[in-house]
Amino acid sequence: MAVRTIITEGDPRLRQKAIRIRVVDEEVRQLARDLWDTVRAARGLGLAAPQIGVLRRIIVVAIPPDYVEEGDPGVELTLINPEIVRASGRQVGLEGCLSIPGWYGEVPRSMHVTVKALDLDGREVRVKGSGLLARVLQHEIDHLEGILFVDRIEDRSTLRYIPDEEEETAEAATGT
């Protein structure tokens, strides 16, 4: 198990564009395992490689069953070189970020997205997401571009700090 340190706002790597992955090899698969170990330990809904200081284009999405419709097993995705190829609709919802601990704000996002990426075998996949899944995908892909959720907030008055003892409640709404 390799839980990595999640870097926080102020670290310049969070503001840099990640580099495209050319070959899905054992090094990339190990990076994916590290991302999974780290996101699970942090109890987040997603994590991008730049958040652990690695400027590579890979994300994981970890939406547990209790965040989705009853009977749905949840969502676990590893996406390499993800890009949004279609987006529609609009939603505004509370977001937080493991790299900006304790801070939350209302962020506008597309309601529906289609993402093209590679899987861990190097095969092209397309993922369609709506609602929370669409939000998490957009949030994590933003990290690959050096964009943080606070950059997307239209109404700065919604940005607020929620102390640790209240964070669990807020994470039920966000936690990326």
Curated annotation (Swiss-Prot):
Enzyme category, top tier: hydrolase
Active site residues according to the UniProt entry: E140
Enzyme Commission no: 3.5.1.88
A GO MF term: metal ion binding
Pfam family, one: Pep_deformylase
InterPro entries on file: Peptide_deformylase, Peptide_deformylase_sf
CC cofactor: Fe(2+)
Keywords annotated in UniProt: Hydrolase, Iron, Metal-binding, Protein biosynthesis
Superkingdom: Bacteria
Catalytic reaction equation(s): N-terminal N-formyl-L-methionyl-[peptide] + H2O = N-terminal L-methionyl-[peptide] + formate
Gene3D superfamilies linked: Peptide deformylase (3.90.45.10)
Cofactor descriptive note: Binds 1 Fe(2+) ion.
One GO term (biological process): translation
PANTHER family: PEPTIDE DEFORMYLASE
Similarity-based family: Belongs to the polypeptide deformylase family.
HAMAP family assigned to the protein according to its UniProt record, in alphabetical order: Pep_deformylase
Function: Removes the formyl group from the N-terminal Met of newly synthesized proteins. Requires at least a dipeptide for an efficient rate of reaction. N-terminal L-methionine is a prerequisite for activity but the enzyme has broad specificity at other positions.
Name of the protein described by the UniProt record: Peptide deformylase
Recorded name of the encoding gene: def
